[in-house]
Every structure is written in C-alpha cells, then in structure tokens.
C-alpha cells in the first residue's frame, strides 16, 4: 500500500465556516483545485479564491432548496474511485478524482437545543449529502483524506509542506477514524432526538415524551488511558463528553503531578461538585468519594483550616477542592500540614504554583470559573443495563423550608442547617452531617442504618475534640424511627434538617419536641448511592 497520496483536488462543503477561508487559501496556494457547494463556494469566491461550484462540475443544479447538492456519481465516484483500479471507468464517465474532502455537518444539536425548535426545523437540519461524502471518503481512506474538524486544518497544511504536497497513510487513517466517530455521533443525536418524540395522535404535531429516548446512544471521547481502574487488576480509561462547557474534572487542566488515577478522578469530581454549592469562599476535602471536611470562611485559607479540623486523619491522602483561586498562603498551609493527592481550584496563583512545584507528586488542577450548572443525565451501570436519571440539581432556600417542631430554629441554627444540608447531598447514603458556624463537625456516611450514621458523626466529632452542643444535623432522607433523633440529642444537637415523609413523621417530630430540638423539613430527598 502506497503510504503517500498527492493532493490535487479538494471538495469543501462546511456548515461551520471557522478557518475555512484560510485553509482554502493555503490549499490553493499549493496548487490544489477547489470544488465547493452553496454557501461555502460563495464565501470562497467572495474571498477571491478560484473555486468551481459542484453544480458546474456535475452539470446538475442544486435543487429542492439545497436538499440535493452533492448526491451525484461525479462527486461520489471521484471520492470512492480506487486509484489504479477504477481509473478507466472514471475517465469514461468524466469523473475527476477528489483527493481530500472537507466537510462538517448541519448544526443539528444547536438547532434542537433551541426552545422554539419545531420538528420541521429539526428535519431540515438533518444533513444527508454531508454524511454521505464523509463516509465515502472515510471508506476510501486508502486514497482519500477526509477532514471533519477545523482543528485539523493546520496539521494538514504542515504535512502537505513536509511531504511534497502529499498526505501519508497514517494521517488518512486517523482522519477516517475521526470521520466515522463524527457521523456516528451525528446519527446518535438524531436518533436520540426522534426517540424522545411520540407519534402524533391527531394532525401532524409530535408530542415530547420526556428526556429519555427509546434507544440511548452515547458518544464519549477517550481522554486518557490509565494504569489501572478502581483496583490494580482492572483496566481502565477516562472518556469525556464532547464540547463540555461546564467547569468539571473532565475539562480541568492539570498543571503538575502524576497522571490522574481512576480513583483520583472520581474523588475530584465529588469534591468539585460539592464545593460548587457554595457562594462564599469554601473548601471541601474528600476521601473515597465522601466529604470528610467542609467549611466556608472569610478566605479560602480560613475555609481550608476549618475543613481540615473536621477529620485530619481522613484528610490524609485526600482530595481538596476550592471555589476561589488557590493562593500561596493556602498552598503553603496544605503542603506543610498533610499529604494530598489532588488540589483543584478555578485558578492557581503563580506564587502558589511555585510553592507546590516542590511537591511534584501533588496533582494540581484548574477548572476555570463556573456559572449555573447545566442540566444533564447521570448514569449508573448495572449488570446488563444502565440506569439513567436527571442530575440531582435540587436545592432549597430558607423560603422553601417547613418548621414542624414546636421550637423555631434560631438564625444561627437556620444558617447551620442550610450549610449542612448542602453537604449531606454529597455524602453517601445513609448520610448524616453535623455542622456549626459553617463548618462540618462530624460526618457519618454509607451506613445501612441511619441511626449508626448519626452515631458515627458524633464519634468523629468527639475524636477531634469538636463541640457538638448547639450544632445542626442534616439527614439526606427521612428518619424511619425516632432513634436517630435520640442519638443526636444525646450529643447536643439542637436543630435537625431532613426531607420528612416517613410514616412515622409524627413520632420523629414528637422526639424532637421532647428534646427541644428545632426540626425543619425540606420536602426534598438527596439519596446518593
């Protein structure tokens, strides 16, 4: 198989025009003939480039409002023709070989994301000719290059210059992989969209059936191969969504340290998503996907020091997340006090990074600033299937709360209750969080019995010499019995925030009244399994 193929003729037809003029200019300057369609051809002609309209080349006009432009044997024969094997039949029918195809597809995802998108709008943004050319060129990658991403334009020009106007087989093969990935993702988007519609009962109006299509097609891009997975005998890789806009562990930039492990990524995600809940300077320390210390303060240094106090033992080898820039003072406090696997923050100051450079094993990530969280889906793998649900973006404010006890919470208790409620959302069920003065005092996670989570939170606080009396307690789900309230009262909890909804709510409320505990219902549960 000949490794290089000279590029003499290009077909360009793009919806995303970014960089296309410059790329076409570079091709033309290297003696490559340009074929193009519709708006792309007009854009190139207006830029003064010598371009031949596909309709002039085929002798067949664009028709049906642009639905039929490139679906012609002279186009697909030029792409699919096997060099050295189909040359005779191509010459017989006046088919010129096309050596590189540059195509990206109608913006279907952006169209259906619009609130006012109709089914007709969606249908008209289903590209037919584009995917057909992409697949044709990718199939014939032995002879033809296919470019579907504008980010590849510079590398293409560089390789042409380095190879006397030719592209190598490895390049064409890698471009073909991208092309098939591109069309697979495109068809998946269309199938997922149509799968959320139910057929009309009257007239021609489709009705949405919710977020979940009949067949779920997922497309993720491999970001990283890993040494191993959750355990050393498991192979693993990290895949990310394409074009993620939200600040996340998937989009974070690593500034130093070893490659992130499977467990690093899972724990960093838990820490970052928790710290996003707070508008004040906040710090979250996570171990094994559970917060072991959370606090807010006047600065991130104060927040870190208070979060660390909750459970210094568990913080060893943990993940630390901030919602403000990591400064030198905080970086110094961390590395002088504890071993840490990962630190993630929106940004890191140059002074902080210089200090951390002395600890090259510490992985330092920046994720950028974040806005409101975007809606999306969560997945949980089960044997033979996939559980799919909306992300848990539920939150409450003081206005949403119901006080069900005889005693009203004080202003301080209310603040503490809202604080530990935010934390409880990120603790594995059964989850109990004790907090006071915007700092976790004790956290009980992952117990099969809720009362034991409450007891563990109290034990944690006692082990660190933290005063529980006067603290608030959050529970991620309702109390099925009064025993959890009795356990909380025994260590001095004075306010409890929980969803409510148990058939024994009256019994639980009576226990709170018996202990003069203020009890708040959120009417929202935050199970986390």
From Swiss-Prot:
Keyword NADP present in the record's keywords: the answer is no
PROSITE patterns registered for this protein in UniProt: MGS (PS51855)
Cite the MGS-like domain residue spans from the record. 1-148
Pathway note: Purine metabolism; IMP biosynthesis via de novo pathway; 5-formamido-1-(5-phospho-D-ribosyl)imidazole-4-carboxamide from 5-amino-1-(5-phospho-D-ribosyl)imidazole-4-carboxamide (10-formyl THF route): step 1/1; Purine metabolism; IMP biosynthesis via de novo pathway; IMP from 5-formamido-1-(5-phospho-D-ribosyl)imidazole-4-carboxamide: step 1/1
Domain of life according to the entry:
Bacteria
Q: Which residues form a coiled coil?
A: none
| Example GO molecular function | phosphoribosylaminoimidazolecarboxamide formyltransferase activity
Cross-referenced PANTHER family: BIFUNCTIONAL PURINE BIOSYNTHESIS PROTEIN ATIC, BIFUNCTIONAL PURINE BIOSYNTHESIS PROTEIN PURH
Q: What is this protein called?
A: Bifunctional purine biosynthesis protein PurH
State the organism of origin: Yersinia pestis
Q: Lineage from the top down? A: Bacteria, Pseudomonadati, Pseudomonadota, Gammaproteobacteria, Enterobacterales
Gene for this chain: purH
């Amino acid at each position: 198989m000949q490794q290089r193929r000279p590029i003499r003729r290009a077909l360009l037809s793009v919806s995303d025009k970014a960089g296309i003029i410059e790329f076409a200019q570079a091709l033309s300057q290297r003696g490559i003939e340009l074929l193009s369609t519709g708006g792309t051809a007009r854009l190139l002609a207006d830029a003064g480039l010598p371009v031949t309209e596909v309709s002039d080349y085929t002798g067949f006009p664009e028709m049906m409002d642009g639905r039929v432009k490139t679906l012609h044997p002279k186009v697909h024969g030029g792409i699919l023709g096997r060099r050295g094997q189909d040359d005779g039949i191509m010459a017989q029918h006046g088919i010129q070989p096309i050596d590189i195809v540059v195509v990206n597809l109608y913006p279907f995802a952006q169209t259906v994301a619009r609130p006012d998108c109709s089914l007709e709008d969606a249908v008209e943004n289903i590209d037919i000719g584009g995917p057909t050319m992409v697949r044709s060129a990718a199939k014939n990658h032995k002879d033809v290059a296919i470019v579907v991403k504008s980010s590849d334009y510079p590398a293409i020009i560089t390789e042409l210059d380095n190879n006397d106007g030719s592209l190598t087989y490895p390049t064409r093969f890698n471009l073909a992989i991208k092309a098939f990935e591109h069309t697979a993702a495109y068809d998946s988007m269309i199938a997922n969209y149509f799968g959320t519609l139910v057929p009309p009962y009257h007239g021609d109006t489709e009705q949405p059936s919710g977020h979940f299509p009949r067949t779920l097609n997922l497309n993720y891009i491999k970001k990283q191969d890993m040494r191993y997975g959750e355990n050393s005998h498991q192979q693993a890789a990290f895949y990310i969504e394409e074009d993620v806009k939200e600040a996340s562990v998937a989009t974070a930039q690593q500034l130093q340290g070893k490659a992130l492990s499977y467990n690093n990524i899972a724990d960093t995600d838990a820490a970052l998503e928790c710290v996003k809940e707070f508008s004040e300077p906040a710090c979250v320390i996570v171990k094994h996907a559970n917060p072991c210390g959370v606090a807010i303060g006047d600065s991130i240094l104060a927040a870190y020091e208070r979060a660390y106090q909750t459970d210094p033992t568990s913080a060893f080898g943990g993940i630390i997340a901030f919602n403000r820039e990591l400064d030198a003072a905080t970086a110094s406090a961390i590395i002088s006090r504890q071993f840490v696997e990962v630190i993630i923050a929106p940004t890191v100051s140059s002074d902080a990074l210089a200090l951390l450079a002395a600890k090259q094993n510490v992985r330092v990530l920046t994720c950028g600033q974040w806005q409101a969280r975007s809606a999306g889906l969560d997945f949980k793998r089960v044997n033979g299937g996939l559980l799919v649900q909306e992300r848990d973006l539920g939150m409450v404010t003081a206005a949403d709360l119901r006080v069900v006890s005889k005693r009203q919470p004080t202003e301080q208790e209310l603040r503490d209750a809202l604080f530990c409620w935010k934390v409880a959302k990120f603790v594995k069920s059964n989850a109990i969080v004790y907090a006071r003065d915007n700092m976790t005092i004790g956290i009980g996670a992952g117990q099969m019995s809720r009362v034991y989570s409450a007891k563990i939170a109290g034990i944690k606080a006692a082990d660190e010499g933290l005063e529980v009396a006067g603290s608030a307690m959050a529970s991620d789900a309702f109390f099925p019995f009064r025993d959890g309230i009795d356990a909380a009262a025994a260590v001095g909890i004075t306010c409890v925030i929980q969803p409510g909804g148990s058939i024994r709510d009256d019994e639980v409320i009576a226990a709170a009244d018996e202990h003069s505990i203020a009890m708040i219902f959120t009417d929202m549960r935050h199970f986390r399994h």
